[in-house]
């Protein structure tokens, strides 16, 4: 009817459009929807589309002042989740004009800002996003990317090795710098500030930066290799964060670090722009991610947070290990590792990838495997992650019975042995233990490490499975 008719009407009349053909410029989202009892899936899917785009709970006369057809989100397909009762994957298409260019913050505010508290839904999870090339082209993306990083570091043909300095809190700046020196001197490429090391009473940031820089330059002079320490620039304000990054650059440090979820996407994108303009690499830690991504029926899957990070900007990001102490199922993890590194990723539901994603030459991000890993895991990690990755052993370096430098030596020897074996055509999956044992004959440090960690297992069922 012509004219405005007040009242509440069902969302599905406006926002459920199964006949809709998606456009190349649409942002597509796959939501796992669990409706309240009695709410049909079409209504639930339409409600998600409405509340995350143009809709509100009642008809408003100002709807007549705009073109809803041009701006509304549309739920265009619904399928039940196999093996789950009352769960559906609802596909929603959003017109590109709903989003500010170059703002991950605005994209998330729109798509996941309000709708997760919606009463008609028992639970809601954003499983995947297809970001169109037209939108990706408005982002700078990673400050440098994988190839530029290798060229800066002059390291090719193998994964990079890192180590988080432990104990994570409580060391003085000088002792912290000493631990950094020992690890890098033993053969690691990087050491890392823990995510919660910012600027506390026992170690202020400026002191830490100075002692770590001293360690880096001393080791570079002694080894002839380029080294780095991820200096955590995360701070309480964006201004303070940039101030720390500026100081790192003035010291000549090669890389800084940011906690992108606790720091926020706006801060992260600002830092990424600074890093590109000033030749700093940017390491990203995902502290707080499990709050958002761990429940399999509610929240946001990490593959979406990973895509968002590639748009916002970062050169490394933590991505689970598949084999250590933290969550990560193999196929799903490899799915978002590809989304981080590759330029074009085909839809593949067996790996949790709901949409084909074209990154149109946005630089790639190195996945970082970290958490409960040690020398016995090296063959599996080398095989699973390949060359373009960073393998980080915190306790697996510093827990060595002879100290930090021998711990670093053990890891470097194990890695070189695995890469050499792989290049000779050996199968790391079946021969991994043999390869490590052979290498241990030539390295007392590796032999001691093998002995310490031969019994360690973190065996729990994965929480995040596909069904």
Curated annotation (Swiss-Prot):
Q: Which residues carry this modification: N6,N6,N6-trimethyllysine?
A: 5
Task: Return the Pfam families for the record.
Answer: RuBisCO_large, RuBisCO_large_N
Q: Which reaction does it catalyse?
A: 2 (2R)-3-phosphoglycerate + 2 H(+) = D-ribulose 1,5-bisphosphate + CO2 + H2O; D-ribulose 1,5-bisphosphate + O2 = 2-phosphoglycolate + (2R)-3-phosphoglycerate + 2 H(+)
- Site Transition state stabilizer: give positions: 325
Which residues of this UniProt protein bind substrate?
114, 164, 168, 286, 318, 370
Any one of the GO BP annotations: photorespiration
Q: Where does Mg(2+) bind?
A: 192, 194-195
A further note on this protein reads: The basic functional RuBisCO is composed of a large chain homodimer in a 'head-to-tail' conformation. In form I RuBisCO this homodimer is arranged in a barrel-like tetramer with the small subunits forming a tetrameric 'cap' on each end of the 'barrel'.
Q: What is this protein called?
A: Ribulose bisphosphate carboxylase large chain
> Which species does this protein come from?
Jasminum simplicifolium subsp. suavissimum (Native jasmine)
Which gene does this sequence derive from? rbcL
